[in-house]
Amino acid sequence: MKRSIVLILTVFSVLQISAQRNEIFSARIASLQVVAGDDWLSPPVINLGAETPMNIAFDDLTHEYHRYTYRIQHCEADWTPSEGIFASDYIDGFAEGNTIDNSEESVNTNVLYTHYSLQIPNERCSIKMSGNYQVTVFDENNNDEKMFTACFMVVEPKASVSLNISTNTDIDVNKSHQQVGLELNFGSLNVTDYANQIKTVILQNGRWDNAIINSHPQYVMSDGLRWEHSRDLIFDAGNEYRKFEMLDVNHTTMGLESVHWDGKSYHAYVWKDEPRPSYVYDEDADGAFYIRNSDNQENDRVSDYLTVHFRLMSPYVGDIYLNGVWTNDRFLPAYQMKYDDMEQCYLGSVPLKQGYYSYQYLILGADGTTKPVPSEGSFYQTENKYQALVYFRGTGERTDRLVGYQQAQLK
């Protein structure tokens, strides 16, 4: 008989996330993409031992060839490097010193660049342990300068994870929030001390800036855990992401008011973003982006770069940033909007490669937390995607493994 216990007070191990998000250190690097197979709409997660590769691609904004090498590092659930294991525990082949051999120069573009790409696994290395992974790329031509880090996850589905999304929350009902329910079945895992062995992460649209880390479960069963109407798992619903597409440097396409050449570079102006007082469904990509051009051929080396200009019509409400997968979920000066008192709006500009982009505006508070911009609205109907990550460290084991993953969307 399954036993269920309501948790009155339990000390659940605290998990502080360090730096999961991709990070670019060199101004030469642009358009960093980390994609599982060809699924650019989902977070970078692959199954251990599956044929789906992890694809990492980027541009170096020069036509000079650079000999890039990379290091693969297994990380704990909190994204700190795993110090209790050896590289041979998680990699078949070589964990560092591998070169990125695939490169091609841009053709007929105003902005010169060289496109580089790699797949994992490859003939030099393959992954043999689940968990979090960080790939660091170095420029061997320049004293092994660190160029960027790219993050992805490998899951071995040992545990069963189910997610449900509700607009009936402990804050409001069918208004501006969404609540996540989570049920975890231990499956074949030998869980003797769940509070120290199990770690959970809940993401909204793959974002780590508002991730819910190690929320306390409401119920403990002999074979699993359940989170039901947990106040910790309530998210601002926000609104559907905005979107635009740059396919041609001479003509406007979806979401663009104008495109022009100033004698030195191309500029694209997104239609000004007016307040959204009510919810209107608009299919989007939840922050994802996809590089392509009007011919949809040789997208990686024929697509050009344009300076994209954004305008958000809003009174001043604090520090507002552009956010999407293409910002690497980071709140940097390059993505901060500047307020124009004369125009009563926020203005921003970012150089981007031709393609499809979805984006949102977020307010960044002094405490580092983010929230939706009031003029953008927050509506319970918003079709957000949620992801659950479950990590496990068994008795006597030396690192955290990713043993469960699930994604669900509010419909």
Where are these regions (language model features)?
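Short acidic/polar inter-strand loop motif in beta-rich domains
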Residues: A77-W79, C125, D139-M147, R207, ...
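Basic K/R-rich, polyanion-interacting modules in nucleoproteins and related proteins
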Residues: A268-Y316, D400-K411
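Ligand-binding face of N-terminal immunoglobulin V-set domains in extracellular IgSF glycoproteins
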Residues: N110-E140
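Short, compositionally biased P/S/T/A/G/V-rich stretches that sit at domain boundaries
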Residues: Q20-G49, E156-I171, E283-Q297
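Aromatic-rich carbohydrate-binding modules that target alpha-glucans
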Residues: I91-Y116, W208-P217, T307-Q354, A366-G396
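Contiguous beta-strand segments within globular domains
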Residues: S31-E76, V173-F186, D295-F310
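Bacterial Sec-dependent N-terminal signal peptides
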Residues: M1-R21
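Low-complexity, Pro/Ser/Thr- and charge-rich linker/hinge segments at domain boundaries
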Residues: E23-I24, V154-H177, Y380-G404
